[in-house]
Design a protein with these regions (language model features):
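Conserved metal-coordinating catalytic motifs of nucleotidyl cyclase and c-di-GMP turnover enzymes
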Residues: 4-7, 49, 113
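Cell-envelope/extracellular polymer assembly enzymes that use nucleotide-activated donors
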Residues: 2, 94
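Catalytic core regions of nucleotide second-messenger enzymes
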Residues: 46, 75-93
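Catalytic-core segments of nucleotide cyclases and related cyclic-nucleotide turnover enzymes
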Residues: 61, 65-68, 98-132, 136-146
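Conserved catalytic motifs of the protein kinase core domain
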Residues: 1, 51, 105
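Cytosolic catalytic cores of cyclic-nucleotide second-messenger enzymes
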Residues: 10-58, 62-66, 70, 119, ...
Length: 146
């Protein structure tokens, strides 16, 4: 089991500039994009604001990181409402990835994915950071930008 923590970059600026209806339209479009491009066994949930989690059963860390980067890249190439007003002229996401360890709870797993997500934000956004399988550390997996 792996999890992706996904956050829309600069979402507050999008809402402030274009209004909440545009922000809501972008959230719906992102949810639809993920739904169409993930497996039927995967679960997508919005956990607040502009943050989503994706549960990936039967998926190891490397596979989850590939899924995360595929989604990140698709978002970057997709036209979103208000995206033209975002930095770089496009909507982007940052993603934290973690896989369940035998000794941890679901809350621990989510906390590690969330920590990796915030590391992705700190590294400049529009990238994927994967939490390592060793306790407490995260390593950069992908940082691709156009």
């Amino acid at each position: 089991m792996s999890i992706l923590a996904i956050d829309i970059d600069y979402f507050k600026a999008l809402n402030d500039r274009h209004g909440h209806p545009t922000g809501d339209a972008s959230l719906r479009k992102l949810a639809g994009l993920m739904t169409r491009n993930l497996r039927r066994i995967d679960t997508i949930a919005r956990i607040g604001g502009e943050e989503f989690v994706v549960l990936l059963p039967r998926t190891n860390l490397s596979e989850a990181a590939q899924v995360a980067d595929k989604l990140r890249s698709m978002v970057e190439r997709t036209e979103f409402p208000g995206g033209d007003g975002q930095p770089g002229g496009m909507l982007t996401v940052s993603v934290g990835v973690a896989s369940l360890r035998p000794d941890e709870t679901g809350a621990d797993l989510l906390a590690r994915a969330d920590k990796a997500l915030y590391e992705a934000k700190d590294r400049g956004r529009n990238c994927v950071v994967s939490a390592s399988q060793s306790a407490g550390s995260a390593r950069s997996l992908t940082r691709s930008r156009i």
